[in-house]
């Protein structure tokens, strides 16, 4: 049992004591009290018990305690200050006894004790005892707990307990509610009387009758243990274990019932704020927040909040007699002789006033008096007469609240300074004193300690010495508190000092005179009780030893905490009951239980007046507080404390008085900590195996509710506590909220609260403690903008105050500030300070504001002061305006330009004014230019400072330009640098010197690399990036650096960048175990492997028995058995690369290792294949689906269709779009078709759908079918626009028609139709601008277009927009006619010059296209094409336009002049394909070698140019038969220029060289035949023996095999190679493709086509074009949607028109339909073309007339439907 039983047993003991340990009114002159008679019979029974039946020590202890109960109390004579013996007063509970004796439970209770005595005397067996009495105990507990809950449990059906009745009984306990009301004070009559001491010689009363013996003290003494349980206690252990089970169950059930009842009752009183349908919520208060946490299972730290403080509860509010102004009833004065019926009731006041006399006439302990009198006035210990002894214990006075303590402190300081210094000043703990004594101690100690020689300037040293503390800290407390009190500093403080440092950090103690500081709250004034005294005394050996002689009761108080051997009675009692009983701690009941209990009861005074009933939570709160104090701190273990604390917290919430009396100010930090931990909880916690739930679906909703309803409360707590950690967590939670919910939250909060939270964010940012990852900076800007909306007016001063957060604002939010913002000098200063963190678009927006004529006038007139003030914005001026800066203006800022971050165009304009080539200080000029030197042309560098030293400062600076991307490695300046390196020889450079050349590594030729030593090469590897190493270089380096023997995992991982150089030889040298271990470090490079390298890597793991057969000849059959997969354990990094044939994972393996698989980036076909393998049940919950991770991306359309609830359907769709992998086209089409079908049906759930959709991702909005675009709300459209701005690659994944529709819809939302498009609208549209139509593009004013040319250069431009833009650029108000362009116009246009027609480009004057300008222009275009966005952009081929652009350089100036012969610098300044075959052939061999990499990588070279370049390569390396593998790889496409005989001479014995040729597209039919025949001949292989590695290596050259030869390929091997071959646009004939497709149908392949799922069609790619006509005609919709778009495009046009019907064509996904080529469309019938157009537009045009449904049941999307409108309105709230 995790929960201790001791609280329950304690209550039972109290009930028994209160029931029987009482003094009854005598019924006759000498009649014994019935209780006394009972005790005597008990004693006689024990005397008759056989010896040895139980533990002898236990019997003797028990007898001794019983015997002592009959002895009257004695007053011992002890030294002064020693407390008298513990003799508590007797209790007279006459009213209660009368009630109890009339109860039917009187007999069962007596029977319980009688049976216990019989058991001890062995008059009955334990079994008989348990049969009779277990029910009595259980019934008592049940009734007790039921009485605490309103209404209680249902009336028990069990019979009432009698002595000889059945054991399954229940106590009626009609007296128990009376007892509880009695304790609450509602019926308290003459409860406690403190009796005078009785003379032991006078055993009779004054009236001659025998006095009742003081047996109560003896009974209470039973609670004091005398020893540990012995080994003979098996009887007691069995008894407790048997009886304990029902008691524990009842106790646990009762506590839960109490808590649940309180929850409901408190909820009905306080209420709970909830968000409305719009997401708005009226904020709650702190009590409601705590109640919300309890209802949502938050674990509040009730100890830190103050609800388990262990301090005695204040007087209950229900006692009117404690109220101010209500006098307490006073008893008459004591009399020497008094009859029992006229006993005096000694008041607390009288007791506390008289107890300090020489002989207190009361039988009560000093400690009880100390407790009783704490509320009247502070207790001061009785000082020892000796001043010396007192000063040795001055520590007592230092912590005492007594006013006299200050006098003692001053006296001891004056008379015994040395002792005072040792006892007080050397103890750093006293720096944490509170009250008036703290300042006195500081002053006294400061006078005794010598001043320190020097105080540390930084954080205090560790450990702190007293002299440093008192001398430095107290001299400048404010300064040192700032250094100590930060969260990081507190963590660094040693644990021994953390307590007092934490106290000091809470602030200085205010000055008080004699009384301690008190808190005035709803309950009045509350003063601390100095309860920390025991902790300080018991933990300090010196203090403890000094104080115990004067106050002996401290020994008992400190016994537990000082690790005494005495065992608490409760602990001894429960020890056998529980396997691991938590320590009970220093509970008062473990220390001195009797006096303590009586002392607590004595604190409840007599009250004669009637008290009205109060609310149940208030009454229960007081009882729980009293119980918690009685049990002591930490008693019962964490679980018991938690349950009690939860009940205490709940019961205090409705009553402000109870709540704020207990709530500690430091509890605010605990609330923030608990909320922070809750918000940090991961909503997805996978379970070990199976489809167990892993996500709490309400967790996200609960967090949203918390933030929406209680953010103002949290903001208030943050303002008070300044917790940076909690602020960070809260801000992160806001950043992850859907924008609409966040907006509702901020707008519904009070204005002052929102402004205060923004101030907190500002402070956190200023202190550098509010950290936001780059991915969430835009969300932080959105939050800041929302908070800014709560300001009625945005001013320049507000901009200055919030300048640390300005970098996170969106441009549109930044533009909300007044236009005159930049006229403020302080604003400009703030921009200068925070400009490094601002985004370029922000600076561009602000820079454009500078151009307002009303601010600063025209650019040429700007003064130098203004230029300096706006320097961070100048690089972001539109280039046309920047070019207006005069040389004088530029030279005025000469020293500032290098660090300004200028772009190429701006930098060139500055250089023209700064560089003076006619002076001699060229090197000094370059040094001053700094980063601007990156933009110098080779000619300028040559004239200023010729490059010659590979380690020189200018050369190093230019290499830094290459490292940061400013200088292109393929440019002319880089070529000059490479010339310096080649001329000096790389061998002379040290490895460290060579490392700085890493940015130009890709341009180093193979010959140069062969000259470098191995240490030099290894030194460069750590600084290289993957893309900076060409495949040829990787082959060369891996062959040199890879150890041939004993390769370790560390060595292989150090070479991971060279993985693309994998060859048969290097792969054979890597042990399989090392490959497995290196999976994690090699994984990032796997995407750079060629298809053949990937296949070879996979082959390594599937060789039978791990034996490789990869000899140099490669002869012999494959070691794998055809058609039979070999069980293989694949490394995780290789699993996403596996062909379906090798993906042998069964359902059990997938489910058992789900955590291993759910995060892998599975391909579309793999996910579909594994989904089928798992046989996912149709009733799978959303939580189960989320547990599948990326495997859920393979979900089938049938599974979606079987989801009944619309809410569940939309949640699943949301989950799919949240996956890191893309939603496959067929699943996307299924989602929207299914949504259309559901909207056409009566759907009662539409009225309940709403908040569930708020969390859907904006990616879903972006992916909406074209037809739904017009129905989106404006807010939803803006969410899509924001998504596109953040991630433009997601826009480029859509079809062109989709992109255009989205752009037009966004423009419609931002600007009315036929109105000019403003600059703000253009900036808001962002990348969508490039897909506007002709009419919309012409709505852009030309001046606005001109000022946004720099932004347009970074966007993907659709064909329509690009054509229209090219026409607009030539207008007079933009750039004008091309024949009039100068260099400035070319630089302004940038890469947009390619939007001009070829004719217009050819008209640009040769003078405007100088070598430098031309190189920069082509570099910018190439950089764009190689960027991620550029690679996704479907721009038209620019070969003709590029040729027209460079015509003035590559063609002679006059027809009669010869063609210029290029050198390598000329080629780098243009591009290889710009030069003719004749010009290439006439190049110098050294120049060609330096540019060989560029020639091999240019896809624009024609056949003649390829032959010319290949001729130069043969001059360089000799005949082709001698080419090494790395040379063949470097030649690349140039190999097409080989003659037939030379091609036959190439050595093609392994897959390494073969794959190089197989990757080349563009071979002639003859060359294809030569390559494959040469390989088969040289390797000695037959076609039937080609494994999937060699089939993959053949690549494009596979089409060199004749159809009859292709038939011999192994279907098993080919079905694996199909994954790689299907990605190629194979130049095979239709007959060859049909043979290849037929191989996949054979038994070793995938079987009959009719059985193929869509994943098979996706796997085989373009090979699907060879499927026979009949088979294609019979394909179902799901199968068709599995065909890749590339496969669609390669189907021969006649075949395409024959095999696909209009219905099949209409089922194409939009991506498939867009892939249909114009040639294919030309062969289609009108109906087929309409079907393709319908699929391209996603249903906008139906293939059947008048909107009739197709065979697929699709409705006309344009027909109005209330359900459609409702759905779109919901989708408008997706975020």
UniProtKB/Swiss-Prot annotation:
Residues 1-22 form the signal peptide. GO terms for cellular component: cell surface; kinocilium; stereocilium tip. It comes from the Eukaryota. Its main location: other. Transmembrane segments: none annotated. InterPro entries: Stereocilin-rel, Stereocilin_LRR. Glycans are attached at residues 65, 202, 297, 366, 427, 476, 540, 565, 656, 824, 916, 964, 1179, 1274. This is Stereocilin. It comes from Homo sapiens (Human). The lineage of its organism: Eukaryota, Metazoa, Chordata, Craniata, Vertebrata. The gene is STRC.
């Amino acid at each position: 049992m995790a929960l201790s039983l001791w609280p329950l047993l304690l209550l039972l003991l109290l009930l028994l004591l209160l029931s029987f340990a009482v003094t009854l009114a005598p019924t006759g002159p000498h009649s014994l009290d019935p209780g006394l008679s009972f005790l005597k019979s008990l004693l006689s029974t024990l005397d008759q018990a056989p010896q040895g039946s139980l533990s002898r020590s236990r019997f003797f202890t028990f007898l001794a305690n019983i015997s002592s109960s009959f002895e009257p109390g004695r007053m011992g004579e002890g030294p002064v200050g020693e407390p008298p013996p513990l003799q508590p007063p007797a209790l007279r509970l006459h009213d209660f006894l009368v009630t109890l004796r009339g109860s039917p439970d009187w007999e069962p209770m007596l029977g319980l004790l009688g049976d216990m005595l019989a058991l001890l005397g062995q008059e009955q067996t334990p079994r008989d005892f348990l049969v009779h009495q277990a029910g009595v105990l259980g019934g008592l507990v049940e009734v007790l707990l039921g009485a605490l809950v309103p209404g209680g449990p249902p009336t028990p059906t069990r019979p009432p307990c009698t002595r000889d009745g059945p054991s399954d009984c229940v106590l009626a306990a009609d007296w128990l509610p009376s007892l509880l009301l009695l304790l609450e004070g509602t019926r308290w009559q003459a409860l406690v009387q403190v009796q005078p001491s009785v003379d032991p010689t006078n055993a009779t009363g004054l009236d001659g009758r025998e006095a009742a013996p003081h047996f109560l003290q003896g009974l209470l003494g039973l609670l004091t243990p005398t020893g540990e349980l012995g080994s003979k206690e098996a009887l007691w252990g069995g008894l407790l274990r048997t009886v304990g089970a029902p008691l524990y169950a009842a106790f646990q059930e009762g506590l839960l019932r109490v808590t649940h009842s309180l929850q409901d009752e408190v909820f009905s009183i306080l209420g709970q704020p909830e968000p409305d349908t719009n997401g708005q919520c009226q904020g709650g208060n702190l009590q409601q927040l705590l109640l919300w946490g309890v209802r949502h299972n938050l674990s509040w730290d009730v100890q830190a909040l103050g609800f388990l403080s262990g301090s005695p509860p204040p007087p209950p509010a229900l006692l009117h007699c404690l109220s101010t102004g209500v006098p307490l009833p006073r008893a008459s004065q004591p009399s020497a002789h008094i009859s029992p019926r006229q006993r005096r009731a000694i008041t607390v006041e009288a007791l506390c006033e008289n107890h300090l006399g020489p002989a207190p006439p009361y039988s009560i302990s000093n400690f009880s008096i100390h407790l009783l009198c704490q509320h009247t006035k502070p207790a001061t210990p009785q000082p020892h007469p000796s001043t010396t002894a007192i000063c040795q214990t001055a520590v007592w006075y230092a912590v005492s609240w007594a006013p006299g303590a200050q006098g003692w402190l001053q006296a001891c300081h004056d008379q015994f300074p040395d002792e005072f210094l040792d006892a007080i000043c050397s103890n750093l703990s006293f720096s944490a004193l509170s009250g008036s004594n703290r300042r006195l101690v500081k002053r006294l100690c400061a006078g005794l300690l010598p001043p320190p020689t020097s105080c540390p300037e930084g954080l205090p040293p560790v450990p702190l010495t007293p002299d440093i503390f008192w001398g430095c800290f107290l001299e400048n407390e404010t300064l040192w508190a700032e250094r100590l009190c930060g969260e990081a500093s507190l963590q660094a403080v040693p644990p021994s000092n953390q307590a007092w440092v934490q106290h000091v950090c809470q602030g200085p103690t205010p000055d008080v005179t004699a009384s301690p500081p008190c808190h005035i709250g709803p309950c009045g004034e509350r003063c601390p009780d100095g309860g920390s005294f025991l902790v300080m005394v018991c933990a300090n050996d010196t203090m403890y030893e000094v104080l115990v002689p004067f106050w002996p009761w401290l020994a008992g108080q400190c016994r537990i905490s000082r690790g005494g051997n005495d065992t608490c009675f409760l602990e001894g009692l429960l020890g056998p009951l529980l396997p691991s009983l938590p320590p009970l701690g220093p509970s008062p009941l473990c220390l001195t239980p009797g006096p303590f209990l009586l002392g607590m009861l004595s604190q409840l005074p007599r009250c004669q007046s009637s008290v009205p009933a109060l609310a149940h939570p208030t009454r229960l709160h007081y009882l729980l507080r009293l119980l918690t104090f009685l049990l002591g701190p930490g008693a019962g273990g964490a679980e018991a404390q938690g349950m009690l604390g939860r009940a205490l917290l709940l019961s205090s919430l409705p009553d402000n008085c109870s709540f704020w009396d207990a709530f500690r100010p430091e509890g605010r930090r605990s609330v923030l900590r608990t909320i922070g931990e809750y918000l940090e909880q991961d909503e997805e916690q996978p379970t070990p195996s199976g489809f167990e739930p892993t996500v709490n679906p309400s967790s996200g909703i609960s967090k949203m509710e918390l933030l929406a309803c209680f953010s103002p409360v949290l903001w208030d707590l943050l303002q008070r506590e300044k917790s940076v950690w909690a602020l960070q967590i809260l801000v992160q939670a806001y950043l992850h909220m859907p924008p609409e919910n966040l907006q509702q939250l901020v707008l519904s909060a009070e204005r002052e609260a929102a402004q205060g939270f923004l101030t907190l964010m500002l402070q956190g940012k200023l202190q550098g403690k509010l950290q936001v990852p780059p991915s969430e900076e835009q969300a932080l800007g959105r939050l800041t903008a929302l908070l800014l909306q709560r300001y009625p007016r945005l001013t320049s001063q507000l901009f200055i105050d919030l300048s640390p957060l300005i970098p996170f604002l969106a441009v549109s939010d930044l533009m909300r500030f007044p236009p005159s913002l930049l006229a403020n000098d302080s604003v400009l200063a703030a921009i200068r300070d925070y400009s490094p963190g601002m985004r370029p678009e922000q600076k561009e927006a602000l820079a454009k504001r500078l151009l307002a004529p009303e601010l600063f006038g025209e650019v040429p007139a700007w003064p130098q002061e203004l230029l300096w003030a706006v320097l961070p914005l100048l690089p972001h001026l539109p280039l046309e305006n920047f070019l207006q800066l005069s040389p004088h203006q530029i030279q005025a800022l000469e020293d500032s330009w290098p660090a300004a971050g200028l772009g190429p165009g701006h930098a060139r304009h500055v250089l023209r004014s700064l560089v003076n080539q006619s002076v001699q200080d060229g090197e000094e000029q370059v040094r001053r230019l700094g980063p601007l030197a990156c933009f110098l042309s080779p000619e300028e560098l040559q004239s200023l400072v010729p490059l010659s030293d590979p380690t020189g400062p200018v050369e190093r600076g230019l290499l830094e330009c290459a490292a940061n991307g400013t200088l292109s490695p393929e440019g002319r300046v880089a070529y000059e640098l490479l010339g310096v390196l080649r001329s000096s020889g790389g061998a002379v450079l040290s490895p460290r010197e060579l490392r700085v050349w890493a940015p130009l590594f890709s341009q180093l030729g193979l010959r140069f690399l062969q000259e470098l030593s191995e240490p030099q090469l290894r030194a460069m590897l750590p600084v290289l990036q993957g893309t900076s190493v060409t495949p040829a270089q990787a082959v060369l380096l891996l062959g040199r650096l890879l150890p041939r023997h004993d390769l370790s995992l560390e060595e292989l991982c150090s070479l991971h960048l060279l993985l693309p150089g994998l060859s048969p030889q290097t792969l054979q040298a890597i042990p399989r175990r090392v490959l497995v271990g290196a999976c994690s470090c090699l994984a990032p490079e796997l995407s750079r492997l060629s298809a053949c390298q990937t296949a070879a890597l996979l082959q390594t793991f599937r060789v039978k028995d791990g034996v490789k057969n990869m000899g140099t000849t490669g002869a012999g059959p494959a070691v794998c058995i055809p058609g039979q997969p070999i069980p293989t354990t694949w490394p995780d990094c290789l699993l996403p690369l596996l062909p379906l044939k090798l993906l042998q994972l069964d359902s059990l393996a997938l489910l058992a290792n789900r955590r291993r698989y759910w995060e892998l980036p599975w391909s579309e076909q793999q996910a579909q294949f594994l989904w089928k393998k798992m046989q996912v049940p149709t009733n799978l919950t959303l939580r189960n689906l989320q547990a599948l991770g990326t495997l859920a991306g393979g979900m089938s359309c049938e599974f979606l269709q079987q989801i009944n609830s619309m809410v569940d359907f939309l949640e699943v769709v949301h989950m799919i779009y949240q996956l890191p992998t893309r939603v496959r086209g067929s699943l996307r089409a299924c989602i929207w078709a299914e949504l259309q079908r559901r909207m056409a049906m009566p759907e009662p759930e539409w009225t309940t759908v709403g908040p569930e959709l708020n969390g859907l991702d904006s990616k879903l909005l972006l992916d909406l079918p074209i037809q739904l675009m017009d129905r989106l709300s404006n807010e939803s459209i803006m969410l899509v626009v924001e998504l596109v701005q953040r991630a433009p690659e997601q826009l480029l994944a859509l079809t062109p028609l989709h992109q255009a529709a989205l752009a037009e819809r966004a423009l419609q939302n931002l600007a009315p139709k036929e109105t000019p498009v403003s600059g703000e609208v253009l900036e808001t549209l962002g990348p969508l601008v490039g897909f506007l139509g002709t009419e919309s593009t012409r709505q852009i004013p030309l001046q606005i277009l001109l000022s946004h040319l720099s932004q347009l250069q970074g966007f993907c431009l659709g064909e329509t927009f690009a054509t229209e833009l090219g026409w607009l650029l030539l207008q007079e108000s933009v750039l004008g006619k091309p024949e009039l362009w100068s260099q400035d116009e070319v630089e302004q246009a940038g890469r947009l010059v390619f939007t001009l027609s070829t004719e217009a480009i050819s008209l640009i004057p040769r003078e405007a296209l100088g070598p430098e300008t031309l190189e920069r222009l082509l570099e910018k275009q190439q950089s764009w094409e190689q960027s991620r966005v550029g690679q996704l952009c479907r721009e038209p081929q620019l070969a003709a336009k590029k040729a027209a652009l460079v015509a003035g350089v590559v063609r002679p100036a006059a027809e009669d002049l010869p063609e210029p012969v290029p050198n390598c610098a000329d080629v780098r300044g243009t591009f290889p394909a710009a030069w003719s075959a004749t010009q290439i052939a006439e190049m110098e061999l050294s120049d060609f070698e330096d540019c060989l990499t560029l020639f091999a990588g240019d896809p624009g070279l024609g056949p003649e140019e390829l032959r010319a370049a290949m001729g130069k390569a043969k001059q360089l390396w000799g005949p082709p038969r001698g080419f090494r593998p790395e040379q063949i790889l470097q030649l690349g496409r140039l190999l097409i220029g080989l003659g037939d005989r030379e091609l036959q001479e190439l050595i093609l014995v392994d897959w390494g060289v073969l794959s190089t040729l197989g990757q080349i597209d563009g071979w002639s039919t003859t060359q294809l035949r030569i390559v494959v025949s040469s390989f088969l001949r040289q390797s000695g292989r037959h076609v039937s023996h080609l494994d999937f590695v060699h089939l993959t290596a053949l690549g494009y050259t596979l089409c060199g095999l004749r159809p009859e030869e292709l038939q011999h390929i192994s279907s098993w091997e080919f079905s694996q190679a199909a994954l790689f071959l299907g990605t190629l646009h194979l130049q095979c004939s239709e007959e060859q493709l049909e043979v290849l497709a037929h191989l996949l149908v054979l038994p070793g392949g995938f079987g009959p086509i009719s059985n193929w799922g869509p994943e098979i069609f996706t796997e085989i790619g373009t090979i699907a074009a060879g499927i026979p006509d009949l088979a294609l005609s019979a394909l179902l919709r799901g199968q068709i949607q599995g065909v890749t778009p590339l496969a669609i495009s390669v189907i021969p046009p006649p075949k395409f028109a024959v095999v696909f019907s209009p219905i099949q064509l209409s089922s194409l996904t939009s991506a498939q339909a867009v892939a249909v080529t114009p040639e294919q469309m030309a062969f289609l019938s009108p109906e087929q073309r309409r079907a393709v157009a319908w699929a391209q537009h996603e249903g906008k045009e139906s293939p059947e007339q008048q909107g009739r449904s197709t065979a697929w049941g699709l409705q006309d999307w344009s027909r109005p439907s209330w359900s459609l409108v409702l759905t779109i309105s919901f989708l408008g709230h997706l975020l």
